[in-house]
A protein has these predicted regions:
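Peripheral, non-AAA+ core regions of ATP-driven protein-machinery
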Residues: 2-215, 460, 477-500
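Short beta-strand elements
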Residues: 32-38, 269, 373-377
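Basic, amphipathic alpha-helical bundle interface domains used for macromolecular binding and assembly
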Residues: 54-59, 72-74, 81-91, 276, ...
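Alpha-helical scaffold elements adjacent to nucleotide-binding pockets in ATP/GTP-utilizing enzyme cores
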Residues: 61, 65, 98-101, 137-140, ...
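Short glycine-centered helix-capping/turn motifs at secondary-structure transition points
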Residues: 106-108, 184, 243, 312, ...
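Proline-centered turn/helix-capping motifs that create local helix->coil transitions or kinks
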Residues: 110-111, 180-193, 228-229, 241-247, ...
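Short hydrophobic alpha-helical runs that function as membrane-insertion/retention elements
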Residues: 147-152, 168-172, 226, 289-291, ...
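Conserved ASCE/P-loop NTPase catalytic core
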Residues: 216-362
Length: 500
């Protein structure tokens, strides 16, 4: 038999069924076999295989849904095993396969084929509710040879993005629809994947042409290149696991913009929790993470940023295990010069003492400042600038310049040895020295600056990456003095005197 073996030759003989489902571990899915065994004894339901509370409660949901759909609940002892038994199972994703396994083991449903899998949460009336993390589980299903995947209707567009030439995704609003489809009574039409098109990725982003004293950070995604399909899949996996995918949505096509409040904890930024959910650093992957009032964040929260800024990923470790999430984002931070906000203001007097200013600025550690490439001091906007300023360059015009520079970098990093590099920011220390070639005058300037400013090795490499990007925007092959001076100017703010 395809999906189960059911020896029922004698009264009281055990009945058994097994169905295929999937779970989540970190950013990826893993296969789970849902086994149902019905045997003699006092009526009872037992779920084993390291289930969490949501999985243990699924027995009550399945019992109610099965009865409300008109099926018979077996009046015997039922044991459900979720294999592999040494991996913790979380969430309500196993409700649908659990119900079908009970029906199959009790002889009310013929066994589904081995290459069929099921995901979905049950309501008490038998309707299906969407679940988190469908895309990574669907990708694992497609890679594991599954040909038919049944999911809640609201998850179908997302799951269909994992479809290849072999696997089909079938949307269902109720468990009854799944049963009828398996019986051949009422087939379900598969969901057709929507072609990937990031053309509208900038439609919701404010334009740079309107900027005059208004927030710049929120406009930054509007000048970044569109997401590649690989980046879109990775970003969608993160949002799906975090439960932040809109219903009926396929892939995320716009670069994320995240702006957490300064009261956010380190766990909110890094991620984690009982079920290992991505934090703000991962939700900003391939996009922008904006931290306003930077010194107001707790020291513990700010230090969380070190690993993702350096490695492009973040590892969350808890007693239940560990998970690594991609966290390659552009960090944009803003802060006042002091607590009252008027230190150095041309017309307003600062009310802070020197020690208060020193204490306020010291909340941002040196190692974190060392990882910030561009530091710019913003002056107050005058009245005449607000009312008489000429329009700024539009986001579309700026985007053309960015895309031209990215095209240069794409051609450069198409060479062997740069498979993991898409742009200058991703260069390793060794690659920086090979790629960032300088004129003799520029090299002499960098040597003098390194010794005079006491730069770290990390700052040295970051200056070269920024200078290389400035040169790309200008179409220069070698780093000259102008490119290097501009990059050094952006680093000058890290030498702001914090001790007076």
């Amino acid at each position: 038999m395809d999906g189960f073996c059911r020896p029922i030759g004698q009264k009281g003989a055990p009945m058994y069924a097994v169905l295929k489902s999937f779970g989540l571990k970190g950013l990826n899915g893993f296969p789970v076999e849902v086994e149902a065994d019905i045997s003699g004894g006092m009526p009872a339901l037992s779920i084993v295989g390291l289930p969490d509370s949501a999985v243990r409660e699924s027995g009550d949901r399945v019992h109610a849904a099965l009865k409300n759909l008109g099926f018979k609940w077996p009046d015997r002892r039922i044991t459900i095993n979720l294999a592999p038994a040494d991996v913790r199972k979380t969430g309500p994703v196993y409700d649908l396969p659990l119900l079908l396994a009970v029906l199959a083991a009790s002889g009310q449903l013929e066994p589904p084929p081995k290459d069929t899998a099921f995901l979905g949460e049950l309501a008490l009336d038998g309707s299906l509710r969407p679940v988190s993390g469908v895309l990574p589980m669907a990708l694992e299903a497609a890679a594991g040879g599954v040909r038919a995947l049944y999911v809640p209707a609201e998850n179908a567009a997302e799951a269909a993005e994992a479809c290849g030439s072999e696997m089909q995704v079938y949307p269902a609003a109720t468990a009854r629809q799944v049963v009828d489809a398996l019986r051949g009574v009422q087939p379900i039409l598969p969901t057709i994947p929507v072609p990937f098109d990031p053309a509208d990725a900038w439609s919701h982003v404010p334009d740079f042409a309107d900027v005059c004293g208004q927030p710049l950070a929120r406009r930054l995604p509007g000048i970044l290149p569109p997401l590649t399909r690989e980046e879109a899949v990775e970003t969608t996996k993160i949002y799906s696991i975090a439960g932040q995918m809109p219903a009926g949505r396929g892939l995320v096509t716009a670069r994320p913009f995240r702006s957490p409040h300064h009261s956010a904890s380190s766990a909110a930024l890094a991620g984690g929790g009982a079920q290992f959910r991505p934090g703000e650093c991962s939700l900003a992957n391939c996009g922008v993470l904006f931290l306003d009032e930077l010194p107001e964040f707790s020291r513990e929260s700010l230090e969380v940023l070190r690993q993702p800024l350096e490695d492009g990923c973040i590892t969350v470790s808890r007693a239940a295990g560990s998970a690594t999430y991609p966290s390659r984002f552009q960090l944009v931070a803003a802060m006042n010069p002091c607590k009252c906000g008027y230190y150095g203001h041309p017309t307003r007097a600062c009310t802070c003492s020197p020690s208060a200013v020193r204490q306020y600025r010291s909340r941002v550690s040196g190692p974190l400042l060392d990882r910030i490439d561009l530091c710019v001091e913003m002056d107050p906007v005058a009245f005449d600038e607000l009312h008489g300023a000429a329009p700024s360059e539009s986001s579309a015009e700026l985007r053309k310049q960015v895309l031209a520079a990215r095209a240069i970098q794409a051609q450069r990093y198409a060479a062997p040895g740069y498979e993991d590099v898409r742009c200058n920011a991703q260069l390793t220390a060794g690659q920086v020295r090979r790629i960032c070639r300088m004129t003799p005058a520029a090299e002499q300037l960098l040597r003098a600056s390194y010794e005079t400013l006491g730069l770290s090795a990390r700052a040295h490499d970051r200056i070269l990456r920024v200078a290389r990007t400035i040169a790309d925007l200008s179409g220069k092959r070698l780093l000259d003095e102008d490119s290097l001076l501009e990059a050094l100017q952006y680093r000058a703010q890290e030498k702001v005197d914090l001790t007076f």
